[in-house]
Amino acid sequence: MCGITAIFNIHDGAQALRKQALLMSKRIRHRGPDWSGIYQGKTAILAHERLSIVDPASGGQPLVSPDGKLILCVNGEIYNHQELRERLKGDYEFQTGSDCEVILALYKKKGIDFIEDLNGIFAFALYDEEKEVYLIARDPIGVIPLYIGYDDKGHLMVSSELKGLEGFATHYEPFLPGHYFYSEDRKLTRWYTRDWMDYANVKDNPTDVQQLHDALEAAVKRQLMSDVPYGVLLSGGLDSSITSAIAKKYAAKRIETNGKADAWWPQLHSFAIGLKDAPDLIAARKVADAIGTVHHEIHYTIQEGLDALRDVIYHIETYDVTTVRASTPMYLLARVIRSMGIKMVLSGEGADEVFGGYLYFHKAPNAQAFHEETLRKLSKLYLYDCLRANKSLCAWGVEGRVPFLDKEFLDVAMRLNPVAKMCPGTTIEKKILREAFSDSLPKEIAWRQKEQFSDGVGYGWIDTLKKITSESVTDEEMANAAKRFPINPPQNKEEYYYRSIFEEHFPSESAARSVPSIPSVACSTAEALAWDSAFKNMNEPSGRAIKDVHESAY
């Protein structure tokens, strides 16, 4: 994972703006501690902070085309770069082994109509020096963060994190996933669309468990592309256990050679974190023993988590309650992972959105409502779990990859008949996924009830957060929350507490507007609150809020 910043539409004062670009880039250097690079042209400046995963020796950025006319900064990984290189032979002379250089080759051949060719996670800025035009784009789901802004002199700016724009841009906002901005068009254009985004196109589809199994296995396998040591996040939940089991299956060989050469680091390391005797830790041990990873169990105390909150909010750039709760242990874990020399990990984010794994999905009234809620969850994932999966790890220079959000896998999983995903009454959630991988995991793991990460690390973590924030914020402060925070007024004392810290770091209106603030039960969207009358008077993102479903409900 890396960090990018760029300033476009420069007409004068380029030297002063170069200094600004360096300052912007320095704010996100934690994302790419291995090297810094900058390009200054007539109308654009692009800066890059590198975390080297593929081609550490020659893959530095900004990348430049052989004729020197195209300049590119990318934060991401292009998983199908080898196939694309083969396809582009003869059309482009590659200068490096970087997976991202295929973007330059594709642009040179096809202009801006190439983004659909990419399978990966990415945010990039490309400058065409000859035409004096630029192209900015973001991956389909928004796994990689990106923000776009403007100043009062008409400069357009982008940054991997909002802290790179805070104080420099007069207005900024998240760059929408699945979109691109081309300077000739002067607008955001959606490039990522799928037939499965319409319920009518999936409602009569068949369900093939083997196809689902094979598609996820292929996604994990291609995401093992790495020239540095990697590991897996193993919470002991279904999703991370599946990705870990598949990764272990292929870890002994280099996937870059189609399994012909031995892996440089053939022993797979797995990582779990929690309070002592947390549900996740116990489950993770069982999985690690069963699949044969070198397992690392990290304990943290509630006080250590509380002490980290201010830094966590600075890095993940949100005041959303469930994201802060879950990001704190992951932030602590990332530090340990990096201290062991590991720079990339696979995780299980996205499965609950794709398969309706959150416990409130038990209340879905019909297949159409179920499917449309998964679409809403996927479309907003960049504002929630993607922040945790990316920014809490990148705070320590660790890259997170998410096979459940792989573009090719999504086309298989989201075209499944929604009826096969539903979990009415006491039917266990994600049943079809469990069936697909039941032979790969211990039975008690394959059929373990969904536990949100912030719950699974230990119930005492959330319970203490609620208690301390309730005691720290007075009733009077809460009553006047809308006066202090007119944009997205906090809905409870815990959110008020996090919002106060967020405002200290990022005081602008743009920062406040970049974070969603909606009522939620067990991570539901606002629309799903209509599924159960009991939801109407609740606002608790923990899965334990779902009575008659969660085994340890409040």
Predicted features, each with a name:
Residues 17, 80, 96-99, 118, ...:
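Hydrophobic (often cysteine-bearing) scaffold residues that line and stabilize catalytic clefts
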